[in-house]
Amino acid sequence: MASFSTNEFKAGLKVMYDGNPCAIIDNEFVKPGKGQAFNRVKLRNLRTGKVLEQTFKSGESLEGADVVDTEMNYLYNDGEFWHFMHPETFEQLQADANAMADAKQWLKENGNDLCTITLFNGVPLSVTAPNFVELEIVETDPGVRGDTSGGGGKPARLETGAVVRVPLFVQQNEVVRVDTRTGDYQTRVSQ
């Protein structure tokens, strides 16, 4: 695998640090008035999700992580693992709860949601849900006319169990588009 020097560090770069695959979140080059220049780097451990801050002297290098991002369709959850299938090779893969993190609240079974799965040595480290998903509202209060003093929103439970804030005019059994990155309601979807 390639080696990356401190002058090649940038956000999004995947490197090995202390035997763990990490992604660089932030990189700041510091040149003090006296002494050697260094890089102050924030790393996210791809296995645990923990963020650590580390300094590297100029000229130091880190080994690149053998991490691959692949697009796969979500199939189902068997209670312990979430199962995915590659759309072209039909190869199946299973991810555990640690790899799923927040993505599990946005995926419905056999919904053909195309997820990005980060693999390290063939093992899923993280699953990223599609940016937007369309889900049906299974439970919400009816919007009462004139009840808008608090901003005009109400909670709604989606078919996957996730709860989002929706406008008062949205009713139960309607399909809405949700931004999975923020968890915000975007629009109603006509069927």
Swiss-Prot record:
Any one of the GO CC terms: cytoplasm
Keyword Cell inner membrane: no
Domain of life: Bacteria
Modified residues (N6-(3,6-diaminohexanoyl)-5-hydroxylysine): K34
Protein's UniProt keywords contain Protein biosynthesis: yes
Keywords carried by this UniProt record: Cytoplasm, Elongation factor, Hydroxylation, Protein biosynthesis
Annotated localization: Cytoplasm
Alphabetical list of InterPro entries matching this protein: Elong-fact-P_C, NA-bd_OB-fold, Rib_uL2_dom2, Transl_elong_fac_P/YeiP, Transl_elong_KOW-like, Transl_elong_P/YeiP_cen, Transl_elongation_fac_P, Translation_prot_SH3-like_sf
Matches recorded under SUPFAM superfamilies: Nucleic acid-binding proteins, Translation proteins SH3-like domain
One protein family per Pfam: Elong-fact-P_C
Pathway: Protein biosynthesis; polypeptide chain elongation
BP term (GO), one: peptide biosynthetic process
Membrane-spanning parts: none
Gene Ontology MF, one: translation elongation factor activity
Modification note: May be beta-lysylated on the epsilon-amino group of Lys-34 by the combined action of EpmA and EpmB, and then hydroxylated on the C5 position of the same residue by EpmC (if this protein is present). Lysylation is critical for the stimulatory effect of EF-P on peptide-bond formation. The lysylation moiety may extend toward the peptidyltransferase center and stabilize the terminal 3-CCA end of the tRNA. Hydroxylation of the C5 position on Lys-34 may allow additional potential stabilizing hydrogen-bond interactions with the P-tRNA.
Family: Belongs to the elongation factor P family.
Function noted in UniProt: Involved in peptide bond synthesis. Alleviates ribosome stalling that occurs when 3 or more consecutive Pro residues or the sequence PPG is present in a protein, possibly by augmenting the peptidyl transferase activity of the ribosome. Modification of Lys-34 is required for alleviation.
PANTHER family reported in the protein's UniProt record: ELONGATION FACTOR P (PTHR30053), ELONGATION FACTOR P (EF-P) FAMILY PROTEIN (PTHR30053:SF12)
Name of the featured protein: Elongation factor P
Classification lineage: Bacteria, Pseudomonadati, Pseudomonadota, Gammaproteobacteria, Moraxellales
